[in-house]
Design a protein with these regions (language model features):
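Active-site-adjacent structural elements that line small-molecule/cofactor binding pockets in enzymes
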Residues: 1-252
């Protein structure tokens, strides 16, 4: 019950068709699906089917089995099966269409700090629209459970001089989102918030996507080390999150 796994097609990588190193694809796929998008979708469907307990293989004739456990020709699921495991899967959506697809597949939604939708709106506004589309599609499909939706933000609360020394002085983050090209697509990149807790709270309350989501993920720069990451989390939990309505689990 404590596992939560995020999945997506993935961002560009240094390797050329890296999936081929693991036995997937070939010359035909390289021509028809050079970025591996269709391959990723196919494998994700297989992954979900396995999690949901669908038959993934056919039982051998009974006399050939060891140990002899299944009727010949029976459909075999992945065992042990954990009911509900598929409800703890999150799909990372980079477009509105991908978010709607996640709803149809019945998985939670992650929207990160980059979205390939550039209509002049801010990242928060674009993601709020993405979330709305996801929820409308979810309701239309008629799933019998309530999904979760997350957005990610790089946030560095500056509480004292040591924070400023590590992460930069208050107000030194970008003042606005930016437009760039990644994987041959134009996308909007979210700004980094480096500021005092009150300014961060003010900015997040104006962020329509943060307000629409039920989960806010912090992007922690792991290259800064464990201590720096822990400091970011502590400052956010102590000075920012309570102002957004969050209560620690220690309160029961």
């Amino acid at each position: 019950q404590r596992s939560a796994d995020g999945v997506s097609r993935g961002s560009p990588e240094p390797a050329l068709r890296g999936w081929e190193a693991f036995g997937y694809g070939g010359p035909e796929l390289a021509r028809e699906d050079p970025k591996g998008a269709a391959l990723a979708a196919e494998k994700f469907d297989t992954f979900l089917a396995a999690l949901r307990g669908d038959g993934m293989a056919t039982a051998a004739p009974f006399e050939q089995q060891y140990p002899q456990m299944f009727h010949s020709g029976a459909q075999l699921p992945v065992l042990p099966h954990s009911p509900g495991a598929d409800r703890r899967i999150w799909w990372g959506a980079g477009t509105h269409a991908s978010a709607e697809l996640a709803a149809r597949k019945g998985v939670n939604l992650m929207s990160s700090t980059l979205v390939f939708e550039t209509d002049g709106a801010s990242l928060g506004d674009v993601q709020a629209e993405q979330i709305a589309r996801y929820r409308r599609e979810w309701e239309k499909v008629g799933h019998d459970w309530e999904p979760r939706v997350s957005v990610s933000r790089p946030i560095f609360p500056i509480v004292d001089g040591s924070d400023a020394q590590i992460f930069g002085p208050a107000g030194s983050g970008e003042s606005h989102d930016s437009i760039g090209v990644l994987d041959d697509q134009r996308g909007i990149f979210g700004r980094t918030l480096v500021d005092t807790p009150d300014k961060i709270v003010e900015a997040l309350k104006k962020d329509k996507a943060v307000m629409a989501a039920d989960t806010l993920m912090l992007t922690i720069p792991n290259q800064a080390g464990v201590a720096a990451g822990a400091r970011i989390l502590e400052n956010f939990a102590r000075y920012v999150a309570p102002e957004l309505g969050w209560e620690p689990a220690t309160k029961g």
